[in-house]
Structures are given as structure tokens and as C-alpha cells.
């Protein structure tokens, strides 16, 4: 799904680094997969993959399964990790993350 945008080896390393429950930190993950240095267009493509229901927003249920976009066997985020992730990205407080909010969070 991320071919041409992100390297498989970077994704594998990033997933390995957050295997333990409670260890996911979005900023570290974005850096490890190489997303921080990508263009706005590439970040938008990644957002489109994570936005499973194509609502133009990433909601809490999609964030919970965030890692599974990168590997089907990856774990779901814990409720605490999901809440922290949502709070970090939801700058306007509407309970979901839009593409501009996602891009701002990636660039951190």
C-alpha cells in the first residue's frame, strides 16, 4: 500500500520498535518510517490509506487500528495510546483528524 512512498525495511523496524503494548509514540513512529521528510503529496497519500472509510477524517476507531495499515499482523493500539494519538492530532477539538491536522502532526 505504501510502495513508492515508504521503505518496507523502515516500516518493519518501526513496527518492531512499538511491539509492546504502551510503547507506541506517533512522533517516533513517523520518523522511523521516514514520513517526516516526505512531501505534502506523499503525506496526503498516506493519510488516504489510513482513512479507511474515506470520510476525509481519521477517527478514533481508525487510529486504534493504525499499525495494521502497515502490517496486517500488527497489534491494535491500546485505548490510552489511541487517546494520546487523537489528542496530539486533533488541533480543532472535533474528535477526529483531518488531512491538514495529520500533516502538521507528522511534521511535528
Swiss-Prot record:
Residues that, per the record, bind Ca(2+) 1: 51, 53, 55, 57, 59, 62
Location of N-acetylalanine modifications: 1
Entry keywords, A to Z: Acetylation, Allergen, Calcium, Metal-binding, Muscle protein, Repeat
Q: Where does the EF-hand domain start and stop, copy by copy? A: 38-73, 77-108
**Gene Ontology molecular-function annotations:** calcium ion binding
Binding residues annotated for Ca(2+) 2, in chain numbering: 90, 92, 94, 96, 101
Superkingdom of the source species: Eukaryota
Coiled-coil intervals: none
Name the Pfam families on file. Answer: EF-hand_7 (PF13499)
Record flagged with keyword Repeat: yes
- GO CC annotation, single: cytoplasm
User: Which function does this protein serve?
Assistant: In muscle, parvalbumin is thought to be involved in relaxation after contraction. It binds two calcium ions.
Q: What else is known?
A: Is regarded as an important allergen. On the 2D-gel the determined pI of this protein is: 4.23, its MW is: 11.35 kDa.
| Family membership noted in the UniProt record | Belongs to the parvalbumin family.
What protein does this entry describe? Parvalbumin beta 2
Which organism is this entry from? Merluccius bilinearis (Silver hake)
Amino acid at each position: 500500500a505504501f510502495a513508492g512512498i515508504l521503505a518496507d525495511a523502515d516500516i518493519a523496524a518501526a513496527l518492531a520498535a512499538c511491539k509492546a503494548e504502551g510503547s507506541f509514540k506517533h512522533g517516533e513512529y513517523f520518523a522511523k518510517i521516514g514520513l517526516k521528510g516526505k512531501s505534502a503529496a506523499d503525506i496526503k497519500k498516506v493519510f488516504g490509506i489510513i482513512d479507511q472509510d474515506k470520510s476525509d477524517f481519521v477517527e478514533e476507531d481508525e487510529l486504534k487500528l493504525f499499525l495494521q495499515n502497515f502490517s496486517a499482523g500488527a497489534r491494535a493500539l491500546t485505548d490510552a495510546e489511541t487517546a494520546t494519538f487523537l489528542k496530539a492530532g486533533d488541533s480543532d477539538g472535533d474528535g477526529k483528524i483531518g488531512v491538514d491536522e495529520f500533516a502538521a502532526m507528522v511534521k511535528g
